[in-house]
Amino acid sequence: MSYMERESWSSNLGFILASVGSAIGLGNIWRFGYMVYTNGGGAFLIPYIVALLCVGIPLMILEFAIGHYTKKSAPLALEKLHKGSEWTGWFAVISGFIITSYYVVIIAWCLYYLIILVIYGYPSDPNAYFFHNILQISSGVEDIGGVSYGILVSTLAVWGIVALILSAGIKNGLEKANKIMIPFLLFLIILLVLNALTLPGALTGIEWYLTPDFSALFNYNVWLSAFSQIFFSLSLGFGILIAYASYLPKKSDLTINAVTVSLLNCGFSFLAGFAVFGTLGYMSYTSGIPLDKAVSEGIGLAFVTFPKALSLLPFASRLFGIVFFLALVFAGISSAVSIVEASVSAIIDKFSLSRKKALLAVLALFIIISPIFTTGAGLYYLDIIDHFASGYLLPIAAILEIIIAIWLFGGDKLREHVNKLSEIKLGVWWKYLAGVVSPIILTAVVFLDASNVLTSGYGGYKTTYVIFGALIIPLAFVVSVILQKMKTIKGW
């Protein structure tokens, strides 16, 4: 088979699991529960479901439709919809590229912690051990410090796994890997949930997780948080889903696929919250630490609070720690391979390269950039760049995509394409949810955050460093335009 022939999924199940794998990431495990807890508890599920129905599913259908209609990755797909729009697809791909350059390092933290846990068990002081022994964090942004060689080697190992999966192609790589990773990941989370539910104090933690505060529904920030969580959780704006849908066969129910992927992703997040809060409830019960002092998100939860909680388990504490970090590694890798595939497929389409050559080119760039985040100041760099990459680049990429596909090409044309293939028919309402409601909300999210940064700065960093982080936005625009102007290099 010539490498110019487009690959395809061997089954719809493979496509579903790969799409779910792209959506389920580290944030589903360590961020969603905290979002629920801090935004009205069970009441948060109301704006969350509204966001899923009004933005999440409509935009996922849009990305599936673009990919399936054009049979191209994001840059050439948007160019096919409207001449001169290739750069908007590259903008999405570059956004994902920037995020992956440090996301893989976070996966490396999880992998390294997993190895340490298997060999040595839990550290006596998880906070000091993680920040000073593992990350070897420096005093600030100005102090780059040394390289954490354990993290560097782990980062290269993660890149090796990603390369191994993607080099095998769609059917034998992405599809087979996700058919193993996603069911196993679900199994690991169910183990953590079942264990959490048997612990004393667990119900108190779960009550904190789900008890509704309906007054939160009158706070617009809660609604914006719900829409932001849905948008980022479903891997929208990366160009991933466009690329994945381009590998679907001609007859594919795009609407059912979008609904299935969205519900599985959200269901996984909700389930993981029981594991997190049930275990934290137990820690509060045994140690006397108030639950509101124990609850945290992101890095603090994953590498400090949760290991401390698991170390207190009456039995098999190390085993459940291994299960937790193994789940993080699987969730991270399933997302990482999807974002890298968005870049690889775009290069294959644009430059007519073989998969292995395109993958080699992409990995070479990543291996040059990622080590920056393994230095002593790496966590600070990651924090600043992530704020602007995930908070600005992705929403802007999605807004550009919506303008091209819905308003310049025609939402009705894509709706007709979807309806020919799907049992659930889309009405005109879909065009307005995807084409009007979604960009308004995404613009509001970007505008409000920009207002906060302009008035209060970000994270206590000096203005110089915040501006430096924000420069990735114009940089992404410039590189996108350059890539559009580059010519195909056949047979390189």
UniProtKB/Swiss-Prot annotation:
GO molecular function: symporter activity
Organism: Methanocaldococcus jannaschii (strain ATCC 43067 / DSM 2661 / JAL-1 / JCM 10045 / NBRC 100440) (Methanococcus jannaschii)
InterPro entries xref list: Na/ntran_symport, SNS_sf
An annotated GO BP: sodium ion transmembrane transport
Key words, A-Z: Cell membrane, Membrane, Symport, Transmembrane, Transmembrane helix, Transport
Gene Ontology cellular-component annotations: plasma membrane
Taxonomic placement: Archaea, Methanobacteriati, Methanobacteriota, Methanomada group, Methanococci
Family label: Belongs to the sodium:neurotransmitter symporter (SNF) (TC 2.A.22) family.
Function: Putative sodium-dependent transporter.
Main location, first listed in the record: membrane
Pfam families: SNF (PF00209)
Subcellular location: Cell membrane
Coiled-coil residues: none
Protein name: Uncharacterized sodium-dependent transporter MJ1319
Topology term for the membrane: Multi-pass membrane protein
Membrane-spanning segments: 13-33, 42-62, 97-117, 150-170, 180-200, 222-242, 258-278, 320-340, 359-379, 391-411, 428-448, 463-483
